[in-house]
From Swiss-Prot:
Family: Belongs to the PLPL family.
Active site: 310 (nucleophile), 455 (proton acceptor)
Location(s) in or outside the cell: Membrane
Bias (Low complexity): 685-707
Gene Ontology molecular function: triacylglycerol lipase activity
Domain (PNPLA): residue spans on this chain: 277-468
Short motif (GXSXG): ranges: 308-312
EC nos: 3.1.1.-
Name of the protein in its database record: Patatin-like phospholipase domain-containing protein An01g04180
GO cellular component: lipid droplet; membrane
Length: 749
């Protein structure tokens, strides 16, 4: 390492190099308003027994009056058999789950030893060590290609045929796209435009509308990227590159009018969908997200839509309120000097826990969190500053109320740091908090009638359905660091960028017997937890149903699992020092490297479509975004693109492309738990505040109308299979989407 490299490495540990390191963004009045909202219990009116008796008259209790039924008894409809069998059955099942957990541990140890002694030996082991030692993506790619050459994976790439995608359709489509693209280029050279119409360009648009769709012909199947360390089939890569070239050619073509291009790219955008980065909870394990974000940022594939829960919400807030240049200076080991949430001594937090039931002080966390959120920044202000769409999952303190996904559509004036605190309020760690809203004069007030919220990981760690509903997200990049989930992660046939090396990719991890035992034990534990939940036998410590921390979906289209170490569990509620944060940054980046090629191919098409859509929306005088897109900003140095901040891009796109609401065919969208999906704007606590909200938020009629639309596959069900209809009706009867084990189980094929 030369002198310049040593100096650069030293700067990453120097806190003075961090932007706004010494700046406190939050105003003291904001904290005082937050403190008042936390202590306000709500006024309860005094009610007399009647008009002439005193209020506090002494009233004798009637004898023989039946006691009011307890809530738990009323909910579970307890009877004699329930009372007699509940605890014996509960202890029996817990005993069996404990035995299964012990057997699962032994199975994983067997698989680990099998892979070390049978699979990873000799030359392949040395190449694997070189791969894991790389700290930047170009060097990692070289090491991955060397390992693929040794294992014979390069030959697999050269063979078009594969069971998990339609190679014949893709092969023919590549030939057609190339042929039509050459014809368009020839017409441009010969200037045969006539009246401005180009038959070849129109034919190319027709081809693009047919194939620019989510997972068209299976080209986005993760299995296509799970057979090699570097990349995918050569045919798939050729198809992605050709598709990108054709999209750019249509955008630059003068044989199509701007209005036609605008409509064309609107259709492509709706059909292809959007990509979102989802950051899970996991206490201080969430600091691995910094490395994942840094890897995506350095390679230009950081999505605009970001969601976070609990600890992941803090990372998401930092990313969504900073520009790319600021993030590159922030995501360094010196950032550890600003992470001071757990700096109190052991006697201090024990005494607080004894008095309040929570280990940490809410006001202190609000002060610390505000720096990551740039003070009392709202969701809309963050969107207007960076072009990124921040989403934070929050769960109401009432176990029966629906969860919310706070963003610039559902809660535009909600203060980000209050939502981050609510999403991190784990019972026993932090008490439920009140969301705060910023009024027109800049002061803060309680949001949603002062209701309190808590940790989003308890019910919706990865809000995939809400993201799809709000932003048409159908491709999710999940960074999963929950410690209780990482222990059970196992991919028997390999995962993206990490193929099974046993039998040259055709085998199973640990052999077929080891993988079969692992799957059986894991599914059996999941089954018994569901039985306990559906029979309402599980106790509710702190008034919370804790079964969802195991039974919800924790993965996405691409799931990144940073590799943790045992000491992370010891430091699960302590601040990292710069050395520990440097290791977490490095591990987070290395865990993202195998997934980058898959993500690059996806965003290569998405970015081309979105940039073209914004270009022609601006040219046609129809802006689609209240703030310039990040991708648009990077390619518009003069900042000519400055649309109105009142216009809502997603509402316009959805209202234009989705079918209009019809009088009699009204269908309300329901969430996973059978209740109504909560996509409404949070209600203000004051009438004045409500008027301010309505003036600042985007068109609420468009947002609410999306709740009452009839999905396309529900109209005209005559063409649907009778078996699909029986399955849907059965799911409605049993009220359990999870019985199919797939979020798409209720949708017809």
């Amino acid at each position: 390492m030369n002198g310049a490299e040593k100096s650069a490495a030293g700067d990453t540990y120097d806190p003075s190099t961090i932007p706004d390191y010494d700046r406190e963004f939050i105003h003291p009045d904001d904290l005082r308003q937050f403190e008042l909202a936390l202590t306000d219990q709500g006024a309860s009116p005094l009610v007399a027994l009647n008009d002439w008796r005193p209020i506090y008259q002494r009233v004798r209790r009637e004898r023989g009056r039946r006691k009011e039924p307890r809530r738990t008894k009323d909910e579970t409809r307890e009877g004699v058999l329930y009372t007699v069998l509940k605890w014996p059955f509960l202890f029996t099942v817990f005993g069996w789950i404990t035995a299964l957990a012990f057997a699962y541990t032994l199975t994983r140890v067997y698989i680990f030893l099998y892979e070390q002694w049978v699979t990873w030996r000799g030359r392949r082991q040395s190449l694997r060590r070189q791969l894991h030692a790389q700290t930047n993506y170009p060097d990692w790619q070289k090491a991955a290609r060397a390992l693929d050459d040794h294992l014979g994976n390069q030959r697999w790439k050269e063979i078009d045929e594969y069971a998990y995608y339609d190679h014949l359709t893709i092969s023919n489509l590549v030939k057609q796209l190339k042929k039509v693209r050459r014809e368009v280029e020839r017409e441009r050279r010969e200037k045969r435009r006539g009246s401005g119409q180009s038959p070849a360009a129109e034919e190319l648009c027709t081809l693009l509308e047919a194939c620019v769709k989510n997972n068209f012909a299976g080209v986005e199947n993760p299995r296509l990227y799970s057979e090699a360390y570097s990349g995918t089939k050569n045919l798939v890569q050729e198809y992605i590159d050709e598709l990108h070239a054709c999209i750019q050619l249509v955008a630059d073509s003068k044989g199509i009018t701007s209005e036609e291009k605008l409509q064309h790219f609107k259709h492509l955008d709706t059909n292809f969908g959007r990509t979102a980065l989802c950051l899970s909870g996991g206490a201080t394990f969430a600091y691995y997200h910094f490395g994942v974000v840094r890897a995506l940022l350095d390679n230009g594939v950081l999505p605009e839509i970001i969601t976070g829960t609990s600890g992941g919400a803090l990372v998401a807030a930092l990313v969504a309120t900073r520009t790319d240049e600021e993030l590159k200076q922030l995501l360094v080991p010196a950032l550890a000097h600003r992470i001071r949430a757990c700096q109190e001594s052991f006697p201090t937090w024990v005494w607080r826990w004894w008095r309040t039931g929570a280990r940490f002080d809410t006001l202190d966390w609000a002060r610390q969190c505000s720096w990551f959120c740039r003070g009392s920044t709202t969701f809309r202000e963050a969107y207007e500053r960076t072009g990124r769409i921040l989403n934070v999952s929050c769960v109401p303190s009432d176990p029966h109320s629906p969860t919310i996904l706070a963003n610039y559509l559902t809660s535009p004036n909600c203060v980000i740091w209050s939502a981050v605190l609510a999403s991190a309020a784990v019972p026993g760690i932090l008490n439920p908090v009140v969301l705060m809203t910023k009024k027109r004069d800049g002061t803060l007030a309680p949001y949603s009638f002062g209701h309190k919220w808590k940790d989003g990981s308890l019910r919706t760690d990865i809000p995939i359905k809400a993201l799809n509903l709000h932003f048409n997200v159908n491709f999710t990049i999940v960074s999963q660091v929950n410690p209780h989930i990482n222990l059970f992660f196992f991919s028997s046939r390999g995962t993206v960028g990490r193929p099974v090396t046993h039998r040259k990719g055709r085998g199973w991890r640990g052999g077929f017997l080891g993988s079969a035992i692992e799957q059986y034990i894991k599914l059996d534990m999941n089954k018994w937890l569901r039985v306990l939940r559906h029979l309402e036998l599980l106790p509710r410590p702190m008034g919370q149903d804790w079964s969802e921390i195991w039974l919800q979906k924790f993965s996405g289209t691409v799931t990144i699992w940073p590799k943790t170490i045992p000491s992370d569990f010891y430091h699960i509620l302590s601040d990292p020092n710069p050395e520990r944060l440097a290791r977490m940054l490095r591990v987070g980046q290395q865990s993202a490297f195998p997934k980058l090629q898959f993500i690059k191919n996806r965003l290569k098409i998405e970015i081309a479509v979105v940039k073209s859509l914004q270009k022609f929306a601006h040219a046609g005088g129809r802006p689609i975004s209240p703030a310039p897109s990040r991708w648009r900003q990077n390619n518009d140095p003069d900042n000519h693109y400055n649309p109105s901040p009142r216009t809502d891009p997603l509402n316009e796109r959805l209202d234009h492309n989705l079918p209009e609401r019809r009088g009699d065919n009204v269908n309300i969208t329901f969430g996973e738990g059978g209740g109504r999906e909560d996509t409404h704007l949070l209600d203000g606590s004051l009438s004045e505040n409500s008027s301010n909200e309505s003036a600042a938020r985007p068109s609420s009629s468009s947002s609410s109308s999306r709740l009452l639309r009839v999905p396309e596959h529900r109209r005209g069900s005559t063409g649907s299979s009778i078996f699909e209809e029986v399955r849907r009706q059965s799911a409605v009867f049993f009220d359990d989407v999870d019985m199919y084990g797939d979020d798409e189980a209720l949708r017809p094929g």
